[in-house]
Amino acid sequence: MAFRTAIAQTNYDSVFEPAGGGRPAKLTIRLKVALNPLDPAAPWVAQPQNGQQPPTHIANNLAGVRKGPVVDYNGSPFPCRSWIANEWNAFKIRFKQMVEVGWNNQILLLPTDDDQDHRLTDEEFRQLVFNPRYPAYVACAIDIQLVAIGGVSHALIEVAHLDHSSPQNGKFRVWMNRLTDESNEFTTFHWQQWPDTTFRQITSAHEVGHWLRSLVSTYFEHIDAAYAATQPPAARAHAQYGHTETLRSAMMGDGSVATDHEAMPWLTRMVRHAHMSLGWTFVHRANFDAAMPEISARQRALFP
């Protein structure tokens, strides 16, 4: 059975490309994102599940902006203004760049023969080898495809522009449905549990991660959600971002590193592109480059 080249679903699309021409096999998640420049002067509460489109406004210049309060995840109001056309165009370009930079070139999936009843054929295995001196693997990537306002998308995200000429009420807490003009930049975190560590994260990349959900869930969870569920209610919000330094450093924690948790959307989709219910192992690109896994006996036999 051959690999499925493309899969289109309501959570995200994906494309598999076999190795060839000196490049490795590749699995790309294609997420269609509708970014909406939020109109702060219009009354609106984010309601992403009811099909309504948020109010939008783009001004030609600063004299034409509208102003008003926009609430963050905690329900706190922040003074905001509408976007200016050139600002909005620049934000969209940088959004795509930063999300892809944050996620790409980290996740590799290596095939194994654990699933003996549904293992890859020799011809399929060959499609995962771009150089016999390297173990077979699939490089994973995300491709953000921006769609027009009101267009069909996998993710609908409002983007508020903070009014930086007005005093701000602390830090606007974004979430997967609502970002700000600051979300394409790195955010730094410091925690007393790890006083010598600075955690850095591209906010928009983290929030897009929540959209890499399964068909039966509304969002992709933070890295330590299962552990957080075992903690007292008051501690859960903090704990879900990671109760160890390693977990906290993950993309779906407070950092930028892809772990086996972040690899799950690609892993579950690769199962559908192939016909193995098991047989894929996550390896981080940095670990692969530092200590290349051993080439399997099967690969040595296919490429003597």
Residue spans for each PLM region:
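Short, surface-exposed beta-strand/loop micro-motifs that present aromatic residues
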Residues: 9-18, 235-242
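Active-site scaffold of zinc-dependent metalloenzymes
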Residues: 26-42, 53-81, 153-198, 248-254
